[in-house]
Amino acid sequence: MRQGTFFCIDAHTCGNPVRLVAGGVPPLEGNTMSEKRQYFLEHYDWIRQALMFEPRGHSMMSGSVVLPPCSDNADASILFIETSGCLPMCGHGTIGTVTTAIENRLITPKEEGRLILDVPAGQIEVHYQTKGDKVTSVKIFNVPAYLAHQDVTVEIEGLGEITVDVAYGGNYYVIVDPQENYAGLEHYSPDEILMLSPKVRTAVSKAVECIHPNDPTVCGVSHVLWTGKPTQEGATARNAVFYGDKALDRSPCGTGTSARMAQWHAKGKLKSGEDFVHESIIGSLFNGRIEGITEVNGQTAILPSIEGWAQVYGHNTIWVDDEDPYAYGFEVK
């Protein structure tokens, strides 16, 4: 018996996948996207697993669901889905979703070139540019980002003692900068980063507590951001972001870029109004910028923006059938 039919549009943002679910997800209860996120996880998480996990997805698959706006001033809402769960915010996911939604007329903007979007982390503003029927760039004015914990020392098997920072940019990130026991991203293979990252995330999660002061459902360290020397002309810095159980972001990571700009600002390395060009593990670039300064629960925070591009590459209809023994997906760990 068929459990559900889902109409999807597949794209990638600077190399990282975005599967937009354009139809098939039932209405979600809740007044805010934070509430709708919790409702989805409690009642419809099988949809996420079926569409993100193998055999229909893979360990790096991520996606989104476009929903009606929660706020009167918003154009639409976005629910972010990926192998690890439903993120409060996703930068590359927003860029891919906006590109796909505008090109396929899934969202009708109140103002051409500008969207207000409700997301679980809050409300964001997005500007986009077009050439003909194509969206050529998307700029996100993200939620406030801040340095949550500084100089956290942990012992990591296979690495030794390292000192890290934890910053919020829509998700909580462990940021590992070059030091005595970590020479920099350029000295490690992707396989080595994948092996070390879960150990770092677990150790830091035990050492510090991360709960967003404005929404306690946004909690816990979810990503590990490894830094290194840039290789692309014009890049300020390079990173590799680990998420889920065994995924490395192919894009420069939007919320990670926001978190890293917050870290740099807190340490006096980046000022309001300055640009930050972030390079991914495959060499793709996001253009970041500190648009202003604000506060989160009395703590200094930045107002970050991230700009990038996405490419739509296909439409597909996915059936989830109860008679399929792998109807709800699987992970090989």
From Swiss-Prot:
GO terms for molecular function: 4-hydroxyproline epimerase activity. InterPro entries: Pro_racemase_fam. It comes from the Bacteria. Belongs to the proline racemase family. This is Uncharacterized protein VP1330. It comes from Vibrio parahaemolyticus serotype O3:K6 (strain RIMD 2210633).
